[in-house]
């Protein structure tokens, strides 16, 4: 159920946020390391609806342990190179047990079909290498 955290879709910013969530292929996921240092990483993602984003991860990715210990995260899209068009989302991440693998998640598989074919040996190879699903519930957008 949506909790209206995204900006009003009738505004320019609200439209931009939704457009980027729906169309962009990469966003930056920032977790916090054991020493308190922010750890940004580019990730493939799926906007699941109003307030959730899904990310698949390698099982040995440091962000897995970061999220277990400190589930608050930030996400952001690249800007326009001049400091504009910035979208920052904050929220809480959770690791999902018994969740469909990436190639079994039809919306994710469709979004990244071209990428998994070009950068991996197909969607099953990506799913094998990135089996850990993480859902981020967005709590704020700026």
Put a short name on every predicted segment.
Residues 1-12, 85-142:
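Charged, gly/pro-rich active-site loop segments
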Residues 14-15, 60-61, 120:
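Structural motif corresponding to alpha-helix initiation and N-cap regions
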Residues 24-59, 73-77, 87-89:
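Short beta-strand segments
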Residues 25-26, 72, 117, 141:
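Generic structural signal for secondary-structure transition and capping sites
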Residues 61-63, 82:
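Short, surface-exposed beta-strand-loop junctions and turns on beta-sheet-rich folds
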């Amino acid at each position: 159920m949506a909790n209206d955290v995204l900006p009003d879709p009738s505004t320019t910013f609200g439209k931009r946020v939704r457009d980027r969530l729906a169309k962009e292929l990469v966003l930056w996921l920032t977790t916090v390391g054991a020493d308190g240092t922010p750890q940004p990483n580019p990730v493939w993602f799926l906007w699941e609806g109003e307030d959730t984003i899904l990310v698949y991860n390698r099982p040995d990715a440091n962000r897995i342990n970061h999220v277990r210990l400190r589930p608050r995260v930030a996400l952001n899209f690249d800007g326009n190179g001049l400091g504009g068009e910035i979208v920052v989302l904050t929220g809480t991440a959770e690791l999902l047990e018994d969740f469909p693998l990436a190639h079994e998640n039809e919306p994710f598989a469709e979004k990244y079909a071209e990428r998994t074919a070009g950068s991996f040996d197909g969607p099953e190879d990506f799913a094998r290498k990135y089996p850990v699903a993480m859902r981020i519930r967005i709590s704020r957008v700026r």
